[in-house]
């Protein structure tokens, strides 16, 4: 729902972290679990990074990217669940509060309106009712209505600050896109993507070897650079290499 790993980690960490501490979980374990599961926020659509990649890659279908994110996101989530369950059992963590079946049903029905946003946004984009950009507007309006009138988690007096924070974040993203576009043009003008492509293809023309090398490089890059600028800067370098090997832009 958040569309961002950072947003998912921040939101869930602030909510789940204190609860886990009350239940007796180690802070290290809680932090590790939160960080490890955060990437599902950008893998399972809607995802802002996928929209950014669609822009940089020359118009890759956003709907196709969204659909391609479901299986990796679900597999990542299941893998995290299995590992966390194993270590929770090993360390003897137990939930001190038990919930009745009626409470579980009540919470489930309370969550349905929020979960419906995924169905509305993704369904609308895939069916062609609205574009990805229009889908983001639908998501904002729908979540605003839920927050104000259904869940009542925010007040009207808080809206100005929320709008200002959103405008600030949008301005930062637009600035990053502008600067990264200039850098991409400079790299294309100086022939850097071609040089990198020739160097990597000189190592191997096996697509799996090339993908392995790219993943290692992106792993290193990701330790000091945020996802959005990394996507904007390095997609124009690595994507032509994969296209030369016949890879689909969605797969990349």
Which positions does each model-derived feature cover?
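Alpha-helical transmembrane segments of multi-pass membrane transport proteins
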Residues: 1-252
């Amino acid at each position: 729902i958040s569309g961002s790993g950072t947003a998912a980690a921040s939101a869930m960490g602030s909510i789940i972290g204190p609860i886990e501490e009350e239940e007796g979980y180690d802070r290290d374990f809680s932090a590790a679990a939160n960080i490890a599961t955060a990437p599902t926020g950008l893998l399972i659509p809607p995802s802002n990074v996928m929209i950014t990649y669609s822009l940089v890659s020359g118009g890759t279908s956003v709907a196709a990217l969204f659909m391609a994110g479901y299986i990796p996101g679900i597999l990542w989530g299941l893998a995290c669940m299995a590992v966390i369950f194993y270590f929770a059992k090993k360390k003897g963590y137990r939930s001190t509060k038990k919930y009745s079946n009626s409470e579980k049903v009540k919470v489930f029905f309370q969550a349905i309106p929020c979960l419906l946003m995924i169905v509305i946004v993704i369904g609308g984009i895939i069916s062609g009712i609205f574009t990805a950009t229009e889908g983001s507007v639908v998501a904002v309006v729908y979540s605003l209505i839920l927050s104000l009138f259904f869940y009542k988690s925010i007040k009207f007096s808080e809206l100005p600050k929320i709008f200002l924070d959103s405008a600030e974040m949008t301005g930062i993203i637009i600035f990053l896109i502008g600067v990264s576009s200039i850098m991409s043009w400079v790299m294309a003008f100086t022939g850097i993507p071609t040089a990198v492509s020739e160097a990597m293809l000189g190592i191997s023309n096996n697509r799996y070897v090339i993908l392995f090398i790219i993943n290692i490089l992106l792993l290193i890059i990701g330790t000091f650079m945020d996802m959005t600028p990394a996507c904007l800067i390095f997609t124009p370098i690595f994507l032509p290499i994969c296209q030369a090997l016949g890879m689909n832009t969605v797969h990349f």
